[in-house]
Amino acid sequence: MQKYILLLLLIVMASCKSKSPNSGSETKEAYSRYVKMDFKEVNSAKKNRAYDLGKRLLETCNTSKFKSFSKEEATESVIKNATVEKISKTCQKIIMRNGKFIDLQLSEVIHDVETDDYLFKYKIQYEKKYFERELNVKINKDGKVAAMSTKELAKKPM
């Protein structure tokens, strides 16, 4: 019986052996798929495309007239999803909560290294300053809008 306990104790001790610590010679280079870009480094054509189409979409809320995107401006999925019904429904919610749209202010540009897409994040300025909203416009490598979305930013505690 003592032999079994001793054998069991030996097995438990051997299985609990810790791994050898890293010697530090095996350093891996940090790789990040998403890189935050400086505004000046970004292609001005892509920057202008994102701003113009984002502003055109948000001004629809003020004027109730939506000019649909062309195939040169946006991908098929964006054209298909940007319907007058969807936009007007979203605009009604936003206008009730934020008031009329005033302008966009570029806050961040993120480059996806693998797909060569650029994500432009804009702070949306509205009449009412109670809630902050952000517009995200994704431009693909062909210079077309691949995605557009808006979201309300969380309030920062004082």
Task: Describe the predicted segments one by one.
Residues 2-7:
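Sec-dependent signal peptide recognition
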Residues 13-15:
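C-terminal motif of bacterial Sec signal peptides marking the signal peptidase cleavage site
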Residues 17-60:
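Short, low-complexity N-terminal intrinsically disordered segments enriched in polar/charged residues
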Residues 42-79, 86:
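Core segments of small alpha/beta cavity-forming domains
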Residues 51-57, 93, 153-158:
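Signal peptide-directed secreted proteins
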Residues 68-113:
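Short solvent-exposed beta->alpha transition segments
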